[in-house]
């Protein structure tokens, strides 16, 4: 499954209205730690393609949604289920940390 780039105007439709759980990666092109976890996000998108939608939000180009969700540091990864934010992971964390957080919420869906 490919990762969609979501913008301020499409966030509601792509994330809030999604019937699938959604992992949202808030990032920026200049952010070194964002580039460090990019391959992890790609792997998760591939490995969970039947269970999870993965999208990216460029915070430089989409400041409205970044502000709405209180993004102060990037990368920030948020998990949404049924249109509600259920968890947040801030920083370039190990893949296992993201997977454990994700598994915790996917078990309940």
UniProtKB/Swiss-Prot annotation:
PANTHER family: GEO12009P1 (PTHR45663:SF11). Disulfide bonds join 31-34. It comes from Griffithsia pacifica. It holds the Pfam family Thioredoxin. GO terms for molecular function: protein-disulfide reductase activity. The record marks 25 as: Deprotonates C-terminal active site Cys. The record marks 32-33 as: Contributes to redox potential value. Belongs to the thioredoxin family. Transmembrane segments: none annotated. It comes from the Eukaryota. Residues 2-107 form the Thioredoxin domain. It is found in: Plastid, Chloroplast. PROSITE patterns: THIOREDOXIN_1, THIOREDOXIN_2. This is Thioredoxin. InterPro entries: Thioredoxin (IPR005746), Thioredoxin-like_sf (IPR036249), Thioredoxin_CS (IPR017937), Thioredoxin_domain (IPR013766). Keywords: Chloroplast, Disulfide bond, Electron transport, Plastid, Redox-active center, Transport. GO terms for cellular component: chloroplast. Participates in various redox reactions through the reversible oxidation of its active center dithiol to a disulfide and catalyzes dithiol-disulfide exchange reactions. The active site is at residues 31, 34.
């Amino acid at each position: 499954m490919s990762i969609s780039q979501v913008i301020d105007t499409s966030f509601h439709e792509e994330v809030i209205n999604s019937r699938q759980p959604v992992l949202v990666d808030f990032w920026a092109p200049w952010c070194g730690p964002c580039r460090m976890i990019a391959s992890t996000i790609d792997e998760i998108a591939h490995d969970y393609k039947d269970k999870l939608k993965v999208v990216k939000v460029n915070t430089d180009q989409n400041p409205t949604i970044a502000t709405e969700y209180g993004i102060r540091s990037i990368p920030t990864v948020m998990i949404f289920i049924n249109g509600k934010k259920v968890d947040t992971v801030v920083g370039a964390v190990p893949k296992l940390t993201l997977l454990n957080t994700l598994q915790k919420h996917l078990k309940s869906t």
